[in-house]
Amino acid sequence: MSVPAEVVEKARKLREEIEFHNVRYYRLDDPLITDAEYDRLMAELLAIEARYPELVTPDSPTQRVGAPPVEAFTEVRHEVPMLSLENAFSEEDLTAFDRRVRKELSRDTLEYVAEPKLDGLAVNLLYQDGVLVRAATRGDGEVGEDVTHNVRAVRAIPLRLKGEDFPDRFEARGEVFMPKRGFLALNERARRSGEKTFVNPRNAAAGSLRQLDARVTASRPLSFYAYGIGAFPDARLPATQHELLESLQRWGLPVSPEYRVVRGAAGCLEYYRSLGERRHDLPYDIDGVVYKVDDLKAQAGLGFVSRAPRWAIAHKFPAEEARTRVVGIDVQVGRTGVLTPVARLEPVFVGGVTVTNATLHNADEIRRKDVRPGDTVIVRRAGDVIPEIVRVVPELRKPGAEPFRMPEVCPECGSAVEAEPGEVLARCSGGLYCPAQHKESIKHFASRRAMDIEGLGDKLVDQLVGRKLIATVADLYRLDLDRLAGLDRMGEKSAANLLAALERSKRTTLARFLYALGIRDVGEVTAKVLSEHFGSLEALMEATEEELLAVADVGPVVSRHIRLFFAQPHNREVISQLLACGVSWEKPAPAPRKLPLQGLVFVLTGTLASMSRDEARARLEALGAKCTGSVSRNTSFVVAGSEPGSKLDKASELGVPVLDEKGFLDLLERGRP
């Protein structure tokens, strides 16, 4: 029958597209599509050629294994072709493979060697008289690249074999890969040095092995597992694949500790499921399982098709990377007020589930990856890890795509967003009002060191918020017996006890109240200092930056947090409601007689001849001064004895007055500066 013109054109386009991606993957180590997308393209072309055999051409990607080697390396022609494997994407595919093999061998059941499919770079190692003499990459399966100088730098690969029972000349084959821990450390070093990071361990392994300078390869955390042989004298072949692996291991070539001999399709699937459950606990990346007929004579009888052995198959795990489009970027507010950008994605099946969102972590991460709404991106999902965007495909970005900017106000409550210089996290400042922070702000408000509301535990707060009985801390004081008694495990007695505890908590101190508000960086000590310094809530709420900086222990950052918190109308409204509900405290007692050095901050450095540092500190504190361990713009004087440290330099830098020992003694005698 004649082939429809549209099918001929489709096959031509598929061949061109697959060849293009072969070059990107094998020659440039810079793939534009995921393995799953590549497999789909190849499967589509195979299906067309199976239906219309006349469309098969000598240069079709289905008739070869990969792309030609790069020109920077010497070419090596493999004595035995390094073929790729057919893929099984489902249990049905694997069962069909087992059925076909058993039929061709006329056997009721077969044993297979099952082992992890490592995600690295395949290499062929030639040993003569037990010494490694040549190493080559797979290349296009027929011709690879000579990487002997680099493979010698991979510590897991022996330069000389162990024992004496190995053949005089043979080839071992295996996978060079980069363990997860080494990959993370390598990328961290690259980030610190401002260098380009690798997308995944496979790219890192390939890039490391194909360096012209072997010293670079030696610095990379590469490893190796052998999985088979190339050229090998027939007379020395063992009977089975697993005995061959045992021989390789005995000669010093590492093999996967995860390989097993399994029986039939059922044994293969049991191994596949078991390894799939543990794959993320393994120290290296895998993307499936390889099954090989264990009987080597049976392997020889089954032979090969044009691009793969008929006695082996790769059973792929669901793809963990996929390509999709960013529909938009939303900003979520966490329970502590941290703003996290999240990419909304066109639904894509990856890692066994359909993914519609991916975390972008923070503004710095968005800038580093340059993710923009409308971008085409590669998404990764590994196990239970939240899906993340690995990288953007810049070639597919539409003109005029605008960079994303974090909002200046909270998307949940409209309060101002604060982000300190040097910090990657942005936070909502509407702690008392923001719906996203309700539970945490209420739990903190009720805690023992804050308002000390006995009986109001975390689970009860979850119930109250979940049933919409309370939304802010002020709502606690509007609860009644009927609503409380209707909660889980809350009878009338427990409800009455909680109401009594709420009533008691209304009588507090200004320091406790300030701490209970949950102002960022205002802990118990700072709250106490603020209450003593300002004396009233009103004075603190209206304090200027200069007035706040005059308070000991309050620097520019804490001052900014305090002013921003009280500047939010929502926070002020909740505070007004709390006061209207009866929360109160006694006015601070009149300040005691002012001491001569009260309000002054001293820093001691060096050694004093006339007294110890503890004695000097005690003398200063007796006159009302405060002694601290570091110099800041709030420091009034630095007292410098002999052999002063870096504090003296800091004082000079900030313009803080310095007293020598004589000046210090004069000050103590006068009792004033």
Swiss-Prot record:
An example molecular function term from Gene Ontology annotations: metal ion binding
E.C. code: 6.5.1.2
Family per similarity comment: Belongs to the NAD-dependent DNA ligase family. LigA subfamily.
Reactions catalysed: NAD(+) + (deoxyribonucleotide)n-3'-hydroxyl + 5'-phospho-(deoxyribonucleotide)m = (deoxyribonucleotide)n+m + AMP + beta-nicotinamide D-nucleotide
Keyword terms of this UniProt record: DNA damage, DNA repair, DNA replication, Ligase, Magnesium, Manganese, Metal-binding, NAD, Zinc
Function, as annotated: DNA ligase that catalyzes the formation of phosphodiester linkages between 5'-phosphoryl and 3'-hydroxyl groups in double-stranded DNA using NAD as a coenzyme and as the energy source for the reaction. It is essential for DNA replication and repair of damaged DNA.
NCBIfam families cross-referenced by the UniProt entry: dnlj (TIGR00575), PRK07956.1 (NF005932)
Binding site for Zn(2+): 410, 413, 428, 434
UniProt name for this protein: DNA ligase
Cofactor: Mg(2+); Mn(2+)
Taxonomic source organism: Methylococcus capsulatus (strain ATCC 33009 / NCIMB 11132 / Bath)
